[in-house]
Amino acid sequence: MTLNPYAAADVSAKPQNEMEARALVRTASRLNALKENWPPKKEDLNTALELNRKLWAFFLSEVCDERNPLPHDIKQNIFNLAHFIFKHTFNIQAKPSASSLDVLININMNIARGLNEQSKFKAEQAAKSGGATA
């Protein structure tokens, strides 16, 4: 099994934020499946948590890149979220509980929702201006 967050995503001609949203939803779904079938095998829990951690490590590396055009406050928020997720993941591994997964699931789903709304907005703007979607 690969731990690449984008391995299963259809990356052909998809904007970055749509791929990121899809990866967040898939990771949240995986965590939710573990929560609904509690208690999971320790290996399955650790694999899902590691996948989520790697996804957030990717986001962290992206916002730390000087070439990233996001505003500083958004970069800082993502940076802080990533660190919170790393700490919370460690706490889950130390003391696993089904309810502790809710925080990670909710963060991923809310960020994915925002990314999808951004994609929709960009597509609508491009359609209004007669340009291609970005």
Predicted regions, residues:
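N-terminal intrinsically disordered, cationic/polar leader segments
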Residues: 1-65, 69, 76-134
